[in-house]
C-alpha cells in the first residue's frame, strides 16, 4: 500500500444522513466527526450542552439538546450510544419509521471494514495507548484515521480522518461491543474485573470474550499483548493468531529496561526483536503503566515500518490525553498554592497506578485526593479494593457516587465507603461541588498536589475549580 495516496472509503449504499443519539459521548463524537469529514450529513442529540457539543457544532454538525422524535427527521440510519436505552423517544420513533438503529460499535466496525484496522483493547490504558499509536503513525508519515475515547491534546480532538488506509480505534469491552470489530492488528493492555454486569459476574466469561476478540483478527493479522498482566498470560497459550508480547520481562518481544522517572520525564531503553536495534526513549508521561502503554505503541509502529527516529521523536513530542494525569495548573488557596491534576481513573487499579506515578513525580509532596466514585455497581463489586487503594492518599475528599444512569443500590454510598476507610485511622471528608473550594481552603498547604479523579462530572468540576471557584 502506498501511504501517500488518498484512501477513499466506499459509500454506505443509499445512506446520506446519519443521526447519533447521545452524540456528546466520548465514544460517539469521534465517529460522528469522521463520518462528517467523509461527506455524510450528520445530526445528533444529547441531554445537555458541553464542550464536545460545541465543537461538533463548530464543524457544522446539527446537535439538538434533548431527545425528541422530530430530531430524527431525514435520517437514513440512527446510531445509538450504549448509554441510551431502547425506550428513548428517538429510538422508538426510528423503529416505528423502520429506520435502521445500530449500536455505536457497529458503525465503528463499518468505518473499519475496508481499512487496515488497529484496535486497542483492555480494561485500563486503552485511551492512552490508542493516542500513542495514532501519534507514532502520524509522526512516521502514515497519516492514520483515528477514533479515541478521550481528547488528544496535540490536536484537541477525539478523532481525525487521515489520508491512508490505517485506522486506529479504541475497542470497548464494557458492553462487549468490541466483538463487532474485525481489525488487522489488535492490542490488549490488560484484563481486569470491571463492567462485570455485562459478563453476568463471571470473570471466565470476561476472559474468554477478550480471547474471542483476538480471534476476530484474520489468520495473517497480529495480536500485541502485555506480558505483565496475569490474565493475559493465562489466555496466551490459547491465542491462535500471530502474537507479539511487550513488558519488562526478559521473554517479552518488546522489553523496557533501565527505566527511570525524573519528575514527569520517563526514560527507558526498549529492546526489540532482531533486526531492530534498541531505542532510548524519553517520554513526558509518568508511571510504570505508561511505559507499558508506550511499549505497545512502539511495537505497532515498528511492525508497520515506522522509522526509528520517528518513533523516538513521536514519544518525545507526545502531549498526552485529556483527563489522563493532566496538569491543569497551579491555584492559590487561603493557606498556600497547589498544583491541580485531573485524571479519569475510576477503577481501583487505575487509582493505584496514578498514585504510584504521583509518588514518583512528587515524592516529597502531599497528595490531596478528591475522588468521585463512578457507578453504584462498580462501587459495590469493588468495595474492598476501593477501601485499600483510597487509604493510600494523604488527604481524601470523597464526593457522592456519580450514578451514570444507574439506580441507587441501598447501602452503597460514599459515606459507607468513607466509614470503612476511617476505620483504618485515615481522615476522610465528604464534599460536594459547592463545599469543595471551602474545604480545600481549609486543608491545602503550600506545595500540595490536588488529584481530581473519576469518570463522572468531576472533570468539569476540576476545570471550574481552576477557573472560577
UniProtKB/Swiss-Prot annotation:
Taken from the UniProt entry, a GO cellular component term is: cytoplasm
**Main localisation:** cytoplasm
Reactions catalysed, as given in the entry: UDP-N-acetyl-alpha-D-muramate + L-alanine + ATP = UDP-N-acetyl-alpha-D-muramoyl-L-alanine + ADP + phosphate + H(+)
| InterPro entries for the chain | Mur-like_cat_sf, Mur_ligase_C, Mur_ligase_C_dom_sf, Mur_ligase_cen, Mur_ligase_N, MurCDEF_pg_biosynth, UDP-N-AcMur_Ala_ligase_MurC
Q: Which Pfam families match?
A: Mur_ligase (PF01225), Mur_ligase_C (PF02875), Mur_ligase_M (PF08245)
Give the first-level EC class, as a single word.
ligase
Phosphoprotein: is it a keyword of this entry? Answer: no
HAMAP family listed in its UniProt record: MurC
NCBIfam families per record: murC (TIGR01082)
Instruction: Tell me which family the UniProt entry assigns to this protein.
Output: Belongs to the MurCDEF family.
List the protein's name: UDP-N-acetylmuramate--L-alanine ligase
What is the organism of origin for this protein?
Legionella pneumophila subsp. pneumophila (strain Philadelphia 1 / ATCC 33152 / DSM 7513)
Amino acid at each position: 500500500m502506498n501511504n501517500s495516496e488518498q484512501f477513499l472509503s466506499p459509500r454506505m449504499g443509499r445512506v446520506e444522513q446519519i443521526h447519533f443519539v447521545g452524540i456528546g459521548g466520548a465514544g460517539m463524537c469521534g465517529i460522528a466527526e469522521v463520518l462528517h469529514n467523509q461527506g455524510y450529513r450528520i445530526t445528533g442529540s444529547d441531554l445537555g450542552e458541553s464542550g464536545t457539543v460545541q465543537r461538533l457544532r463548530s464543524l457544522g454538525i446539527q446537535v439538538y439538546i434533548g431527545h425528541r422524535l422530530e430530531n430524527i427527521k431525514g435520517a437514513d440510519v440512527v446510531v445509538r450510544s450504549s448509554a441510551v436505552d431502547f425506550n428513548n423517544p428517538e429510538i422508538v420513533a426510528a423503529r416505528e419509521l423502520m429506520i435502521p438503529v445500530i449500536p455505536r460499535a457497529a458503525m465503528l466496525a463499518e468505518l473499519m471494514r475496508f481499512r487496515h484496522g488497529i484496535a486497542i483493547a483492555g480494561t485500563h490504558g486503552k485511551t492512552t495507548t490508542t493516542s500513542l499509536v495514532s501519534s507514532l503513525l502520524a509522526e512516521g508519515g502514515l497519516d492514520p484515521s483515528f477514533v479515541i475515547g478521550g481528547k488528544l491534546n496535540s490536536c484537541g480532538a477525539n478523532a481525525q480522518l487521515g489520508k491512508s488506509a490505517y485506522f486506529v480505534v479504541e475497542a470497548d469491552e464494557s458492553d462487549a461491543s468490541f466483538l463487532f470489530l474485525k481489525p488487522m492488528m489488535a492490542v490488549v493492555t490488560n484484563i481486569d474485573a470491571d463492567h462485570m454486569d455485562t459478563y453476568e459476574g463471571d470473570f471466565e466469561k470476561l476472559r474468554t470474550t477478550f480471547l474471542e476478540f483476538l480471534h476476530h483478527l484474520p489468520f495473517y493479522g497480529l495480536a500485541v499483548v502485555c506480558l505483565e498482566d496475569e490474565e493475559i498470560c493465562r489466555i496466551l497459550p490459547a491465542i491462535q493468531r500471530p502474537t507479539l508480547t511487550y513488558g519488562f520481562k526478559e521473554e517479552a518481544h518488546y522489553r523496557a529496561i533501565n527505566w527511570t522517572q525524573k519528575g514527569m520525564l520517563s526514560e527507558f531503553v526498549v529492546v526489540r526483536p532482531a533486526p531492530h536495534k534498541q531505542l532510548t526513549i524519553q517520554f513526558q508521561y509518568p508511571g510504570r503503566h505508561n511505559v507499558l502503554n508506550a511499549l505497545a505503541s512502539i511495537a505497532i509502529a515498528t511492525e508497520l515500518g515506522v522509522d526509528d527516529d520517528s518513533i523516538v521523536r513521536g514519544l518525545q513530542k507526545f502531549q498526552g490525553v485529556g483527563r489522563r494525569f493532566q496538569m491543569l495548573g497551579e491555584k492559590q488557596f487561603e493557606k498556600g498554592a497547589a498544583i491541580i491534576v485531573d485524571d479519569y481513573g475510576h477503577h481501583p487499579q487505575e487509582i493505584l497506578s496514578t498514585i504510584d506515578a504521583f509518588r514518583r513525580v512528587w515524592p516529597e509532596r502531599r497528595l490531596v485526593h478528591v475522588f468521585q466514585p463512578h457507578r453504584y455497581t462498580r462501587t459495590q463489586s469493588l468495595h474492598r479494593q476501593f477501601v485499600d487503594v483510597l487509604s493510600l492518599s494523604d488527604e481524601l475528599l470523597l464526593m457522592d457516587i456519580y450514578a451514570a444512569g444507574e439506580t441507587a443500590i441501598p447501602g452503597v454510598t460514599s459515606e459507607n465507603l468513607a466509614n470503612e476507610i476511617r476505620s483504618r485511622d485515615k481522615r476522610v471528608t465528604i464534599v460536594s461541588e459547592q463545599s469543595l473550594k471551602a474545604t480545600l481552603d481549609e486543608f491545602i498547604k503550600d506545595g500540595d498536589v490536588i488529584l481530581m479523579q473519576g469518570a463522572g462530572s468531576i472533570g468539569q468540576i476540576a476545570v471550574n475549580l481552576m477557573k472560577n471557584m
